[in-house]
A protein has these predicted regions:
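Alpha/beta-hydrolase-fold enzymes
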Residues: 145-150, 161-305
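Catalytic active-site module of serine/aspartate enzymes centered on a nucleophile-bearing elbow/loop
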Residues: 351-388
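Short beta-strand/loop motif that positions the catalytic acidic residue
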Residues: 320, 325-328, 332
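Alpha/beta-hydrolase active-site loop
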Residues: 121-146
Length: 388
């Protein structure tokens, strides 16, 4: 149990957090606060998960459409967090795009199912395979039907790139609905991942069902109001714990203090972690162990039932025939250059190989880097315009 002294510290921290101006945690509220119009839409997948999308509508009807899809433990909030003139969603909106931001099952905005409450284990019985097979296609279909467009452009970060490739592997008919796909920090092959956390734990947790046995197939890194308020206060730029908060980010994606604005830390804590399943994390650990881009490994007992073989089949990258543009960093601990280039060499329509011209560019710089516009977003916009 916590002693009186510890309780006092926690209450003091929470009191300070609640007394000051709290960072906005809701994506739609943030967009309005930044001076943009916003719409909230929902779609139900064919397996009954209810997903929420955020849209920054265009000023003119018939504008070209872009879908932004987040990484693991993230949400639509990441695309607007850095504010006007810096965040990708606003940059694309200012350029005349109809901007839609998806949310995968299990995150802050998509914790809903037609039949299952989130406290049932079965709700969390999915990996990013299901996000690619069900969530992304449902999101695309809804957007195209709502806007009357036949195609859209896709931008994904991290797991948002993974699920795009899964969709194309398993549902190649969606190639016809994509003008171009821009993959930031593309996560497919991950055998050379440098993240010390992954390298330490993946050999154990990446064994079939190992992590599920240890943790339970439930939410990975669940958050609540208490944790959020505590994180916001501890991660303020003036906090003595600010460096600890920054190091948490660096340990995941690579050290790059030049691209991290400490003033952004408390805003990151207001929106992240946004929710994911244990199996999503386990699936990435399996990718590191196997050095393959393949389906979820249930074990030699269940795999024959699921796949008709003892090992899970590889995803069919040859099916990703819509133009794919790769953007990656030399200091990305999650997506190593050699892994990205293996992906590049297997894509049938690789339209751009873009190594960010900043030596220390890390995995999370794609969404939170202070110079993301200069080094990445300007190039993304230029390439997108070439497909209109």
């Amino acid at each position: 149990m916590m002693g009186a002294f510890q309780v006092g510290i926690v209450l003091t921290i929470l009191g300070l957090a609640l007394a000051g101006e709290r960072p906005i945690s809701d994506c739609a509220e943030r967009i309005v606060d930044d001076g943009y119009a916003v719409e909230t839409h929902q779609v139900t997948t064919t397996d009954n998960y209810i997903l929420t999308m955020h849209r920054i509508p265009p000023k003119e009807s018939g504008a070209p459409v872009v879908l932004l899809f987040h990484g693991m433990l993230s949400s639509s909030s990441d695309w607007v967090l850095m504010g006007p003139g810096k965040a990708l969603a606003y940059i694309l909106s200012d350029a005349g795009y109809d901007v839609w931001m998806g949310n995968a099952r299990g995150n802050t905005y998509s914790k809903a199912h037609k039949y299952w409450p989130t406290y049932w284990q079965i709700f969390w019985n999915f990996s990013w395979n299901e996000i690619g097979i069900y969530d992304v296609p449902a999101t695309i279909d809804y957007i195209l039907e709502h806007t009357g467009q036949k195609q859209l452009q896709y931008v994904g970060h991290s797991q948002g790139t993974t699920v795009y490739l899964v969709m194309m592997s398993e549902k190649p008919e969606y190639n016809d609905k994509i003008k171009s796909a821009h993959l930031l920090g593309p996560a497919a092959y991950m055998g050379n991942m440098k993240s010390p956390l992954t390298r330490a734990f993946a050999p154990i947790l990446g064994q079939p069902n190992a992590m599920v046995e240890l943790v339970g197939s439930m939410e990975f890194m669940p958050s609540n109001q208490f944790k959020q308020d505590l994180g916001i206060e501890m991660c303020q730029a003036t906090s003595p714990y600010a460096d600890m908060c920054a190091n948490e980010i660096f340990l995941i994606g690579g050290y790059d203090s030049e691209q991290l604005d400490y003033e952004l830390l408390e805003h990151i804590k207001a929106t992240s972690p946004a929710g994911a399943s244990v199996n999503q994390n386990l699936h990435f650990c399996q990718e590191f162990n196997s050095k393959k881009f393949r389906k979820f490994d249930y074990s030699v007992i269940r795999n024959p039932y699921e796949y008709g073989s003892y090992t899970p089949p590889n995803y069919k990258l040859k099916n990703a025939k819509a133009p794919v543009l790769l953007y990656y960093g030399a200091n990305d601990w999650m997506c190593d250059i050699s892994d990205v280039r293996q992906l590049r060499d297997e894509l049938p329509n690789m339209a751009l190989d873009y190594l960010v011209p900043f030596e220390k560019w890390a995995h999370l710089d794609f969404i939170w880097g202070t110079e993301a516009k200069k080094y990445v977003y300007d190039e993304v916009l230029k390439q997108m315009l070439s497909y209109e």
